[in-house]
């Protein structure tokens, strides 16, 4: 009974979120996509709470990088679909996770790196489905996804639910990556990335997308538990510790987020 109540509550919250998205917020996305300008509404820092537009976002990401991130996401969706009926290689999970993590806000705004990652994703897809690239009658089942199809989706509910799925698995990929570098993985978590990415490309109604949104939350909890296990097993359980707050002359090395492995190496 408590589980059922929780699910109903979450569904109502998501429905309320979708119904209250400003019309200008959605209209601007279509306008700026058509004009090839910057538009991103991934994070809570978006300009005017309507999304970042123009030459660059609040985070510093420019239109070219935003477009490359969309292209990378579309390539990841193509790779995920290719793995639907074909076995992965030993590197596919890592490429999916690293690719999603790369598109998280403020992680990587380097155009050359993004371009190289797009190429790596496409090369991995060729290994998974080697015959598709030379097929004389392509079926499109493993084609890279054009993110404009999502941003220009006329149904606001469908567009919003798919966006929630995308942004959710991007954040989950960050947790998964940090656990992975410490040698910890979870097949349930890894498999869900493929499912969620594929669902973004499918022509589905809200009643089919909402359960996937809820599943994002469920799997993310498993991923957070995985990261906690990785960190505590490797470095021990955190305890309150006094640290000096003295300001000293630099230079400094700043370590942020969950990069505990990087700190250990330093």
What are these regions (language model features)?
Residues 8-10:
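Short hydrophobic alpha-helical segments enriched in small aliphatic residues
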Residues 13-33:
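Short, Lys/Arg-enriched N-terminal segments with co-localized hydrophobic residues
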Residues 35-265:
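Metallocofactor- and cofactor-centric catalytic cores in central/energy metabolism, strongly enriched
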């Amino acid at each position: 009974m408590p589980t059922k109540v929780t699910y109903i509550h979450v569904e109502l919250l998501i429905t309320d979120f979708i119904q209250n998205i400003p019309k200008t917020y959605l209209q601007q996305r279509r306008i700026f996509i058509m004009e090839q300008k910057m538009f991103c509404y991934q994070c809570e820092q978006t300009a005017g709470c309507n999304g970042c537009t123009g030459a660059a976002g609040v985070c510093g990401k420019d239109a070219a990088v935003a477009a490359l991130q969309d292209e990378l996401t579309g390539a990841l969706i193509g790779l995920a679909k290719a793995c639907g009926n074909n076995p992965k290689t030993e590197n596919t999970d890592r490429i999916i996770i690293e690719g999603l993590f790369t598109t998280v806000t403020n992680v990587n705004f380097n155009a050359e790196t993004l371009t190289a990652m797009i190429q790596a994703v496409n090369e991995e897809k060729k290994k998974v489905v080697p015959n598709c690239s030379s097929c004389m009658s392509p079926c499109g089942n493993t084609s890279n996804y054009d993110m404009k199809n999502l941003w220009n989706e006329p149904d606001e509910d469908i567009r919003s639910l798919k966006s929630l799925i995308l942004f959710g698995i991007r954040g989950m990929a960050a947790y998964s990556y940090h656990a992975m570098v410490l040698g910890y993985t979870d097949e349930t978590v890894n498999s869900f990335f493929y499912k969620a990415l594929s669902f973004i490309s499918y022509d589905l109604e809200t009643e089919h997308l909402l359960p996937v949104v809820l599943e994002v939350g469920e799997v993310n909890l498993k991923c957070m538990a995985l990261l906690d296990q990785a960190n505590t097993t490797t470095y021990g359980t955190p305890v309150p510790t006094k640290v000096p707050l003295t300001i000293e002359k630099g230079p400094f090395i700043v370590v942020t987020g969950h990069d505990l492995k990087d700190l250990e190496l330093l």
